[in-house]
Amino acid sequence: ASCKCDDDGPDVRSATFTGTVDFWNCNEGWEKCTAVYTPVASCCRKKK
């Protein structure tokens, strides 16, 4: 599932969701792109 990274923009309707929901921690080579901590899932994005 896709999720909204912090820098995708504040407007949920017009924002592009560039993150991917990952359960627990992000995969290797990916980084968490939200400041909000949720224990079950992280919003991750491939490292540039």
From Swiss-Prot:
Keyword tags: Disulfide bond, Ion channel impairing toxin, Nematocyst, Neurotoxin, Secreted, Toxin, Voltage-gated sodium channel impairing toxin
Family affiliation: Belongs to the sea anemone sodium channel inhibitory toxin family. Type II subfamily.
Organism field: Heteractis magnifica (Magnificent sea anemone)
UniProt-listed Pfam families: Toxin_4
Statement: the UniProt record of this protein carries the keyword Disulfide bond: yes
More info: A synonymy between H.magnifica and R.crispa is controversial.
GO (cellular component) term, any one: extracellular region
Disulphide linkage map: C3-C43, C5-C33, C26-C44
Cellular localisation: Secreted; Nematocyst
GO molecular function: sodium channel regulator activity; toxin activity
One record GO biological process: regulation of signal transduction
Function: Binds specifically to voltage-gated sodium channels (Nav), thereby delaying their inactivation during signal transduction. Its toxicity is weaker than that of RpIII (AC P08380).
Transmembrane segments: none
Superkingdom classification of source: Eukaryota
Protein name: Delta-stichotoxin-Hmg4a
Keyword check for Secreted: yes
